[in-house]
């Protein structure tokens, strides 16, 4: 794997960008690294089912049964599983890992609700109808790491035919979404579901987006309300409305490249952003100036000119277990 995000113990706070500059060649070691980074590394860290039971599943029934409890467990998905159904509820202390690129859930998604300490890695989730929920939904939960997933639908239908790809709502906290391929969708990723939910969401919704490849997206790449976001080392290709900061959200946007976007970074209803070393590809940054200049963990930046070569072909479901 050819991206980087330096991992630091969860107790660090207020660090400047002291980590060494990343190189494309240095990114390969992360493929086998099981430690969460970004906001998911804080608040005690995110270890998923490490140290628990191990199960391999290849059917909808077996998958649903395997992931539901709160006991420590690692659930490997072998091959595709297709089922038109509501989201499968995922228990705490769970790692869901696709064994290779054939591990794709089609027609149903995952719901992490009122849970903690969950890892979802190397998994495909696609074409989940709106009536069945998001591809990956995180609600009222903390310490969730979504890494190397491939989430998509299509844009052949209207914008309400599918729901979100990765939505973080209802005061969820300490979430990292990394190294993922997020593509072919109308409304991709939402942090904070409603302008009217500030009382619940304020002080929560801390989310890191790192090393992601966004492609053929209409909007919400991502959209953030009330919370705190850090978006870095990501490549945005043909994303109409990119990063939307709104309703008091504070977002730090660094080392990203945009190609074919009309609105790369913008505010709605007093959302704020600080941006550094971003190539907006001719699109405008119209976001209000924010105050988030540091985050309480260490990380390394590729530089906007190197993001495409490091992320495209590496982000997504590219690992093997």
Curated annotation (Swiss-Prot):
Keywords assigned by UniProt, alphabetized: Calcium, Carbohydrate metabolism, Cell wall biogenesis/degradation, Glycoprotein, Lyase, Metal-binding, Polysaccharide degradation, Secreted, Signal
Any one GO CC term of the record: extracellular region
> What does it do?
Pectinolytic enzyme consist of four classes of enzymes: pectin lyase, polygalacturonase, pectin methylesterase and rhamnogalacturonase. Among pectinolytic enzymes, pectin lyase is the most important in depolymerization of pectin, since it cleaves internal glycosidic bonds of highly methylated pectins. Favors pectate, the anion, over pectin, the methyl ester.
Q: Looking at the record's lineage, which domain of life comes first?
A: Eukaryota
Q: Which cofactor does it need?
A: Ca(2+)
- Attached carbohydrates are found at 93, 238
User: What subcellular locations does the record give?
Assistant: Secreted
Which InterPro entries does the record match to this protein? Pec_lyase (IPR002022), Pectin_lyas_fold (IPR012334), Pectin_lyase_fold/virulence (IPR011050), PEL (IPR045032)
Q: Could you tell me which PANTHER family the record lists for this protein?
A: PECTATE LYASE 18-RELATED (PTHR31683), PECTATE LYASE 21-RELATED (PTHR31683:SF18)
Active site: residue positions: 220
Protein EC: 4.2.2.2
Pfam entry (one): Pectate_lyase_4
Q: Catalyzes what?
A: Eliminative cleavage of (1->4)-alpha-D-galacturonan to give oligosaccharides with 4-deoxy-alpha-D-galact-4-enuronosyl groups at their non-reducing ends
Gene name, Swiss-Prot/TrEMBL: plyA
Q: What is this protein called?
A: Probable pectate lyase A
Q: Which positions are annotated as binding Ca(2+)?
A: 134, 163, 167
Signal peptide from the UniProt entry: 1-18
Looking at its record, which EC class is this enzyme? lyase
Enumerate the Gene Ontology biological process terms: cell wall organization; pectin catabolic process
Under the heading SUPFAM superfamilies, the entry gives:
Pectin lyase-like (SSF51126)
What family does the Swiss-Prot or TrEMBL record give for this protein?
Answer: Belongs to the polysaccharide lyase 1 family.
**How does the cofactor bind to this protein, according to its record?**
Binds 1 Ca(2+) ion per subunit.
One GO MF term on file is: pectate lyase activity
